[in-house]
Regions:
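Negatively charged, low-complexity tracts enriched in Asp/Glu with abundant Ser/Thr
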Residues: 1-55
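Short aromatic-glycine-(Arg/Gly/Cys) micro-motifs in beta-strand/loop hairpins
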Residues: 8, 14-15, 19, 56-84
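Amphipathic alpha-helical interaction segments
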Residues: 21, 31, 60-61, 97
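Polar low-complexity intrinsically disordered regions enriched in Ser/Thr and small residues
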Residues: 27, 44, 60, 86-88
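Short, Lys/Arg-enriched charge-dense amphipathic segments
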Residues: 49-60, 110-112
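Ampiphathic alpha-helical segments that act as solvent-exposed interaction surfaces
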Residues: 78-114
Length: 114
């Protein structure tokens, strides 16, 4: 299995810029590693780099699963995990914008606005 490349400075710039546009201020992000199954049939977990941030009680994570391959989810508690409905993105900007929109829609639905 090919090694998954680390998150690049340009990818971090995309995340930071998108979050600043969304929230109107700099959002602290963290780089970490996570172990996930890249394919549902995989028995072994693969280590992949992630970008994580927390905003207003919601946790966001973007997994880099390969060169120009990204997955994402947001969660409030371990048992409250949500995604965008797209398994994997080949464009980081589309991934993060879709993630932020899915969370905003979820929050609006929870408030009864949708």
């Amino acid at each position: 299995m090919p090694e998954i490349p680390d998150i690049t400075e340009s990818e971090l710039w995309i995340v930071d810029t998108t979050l600043k546009e969304r929230y109107g201020e700099k959002v602290e992000t963290q780089i970490a590693d996570a172990e996930i199954r890249l394919m549902p049939s995989d028995r072994d977990l693969s280590s992949c780099p992630v970008v994580y941030w927390n905003r207003e009680g919601c946790n966001f994570i973007i997994f880099k699963t390969g060169s120009r391959k990204y997955r994402c989810q947001f969660f409030y508690r371990g048992y409250q995990q949500y995604g965008t409905g797209v398994h994997e993105y080949d464009d980081l900007t589309e991934c993060i914008v879709s993630l932020l929109q899915a969370q905003a829609d979820h929050a609006a639905k929870e408030r009864g606005d949708l």
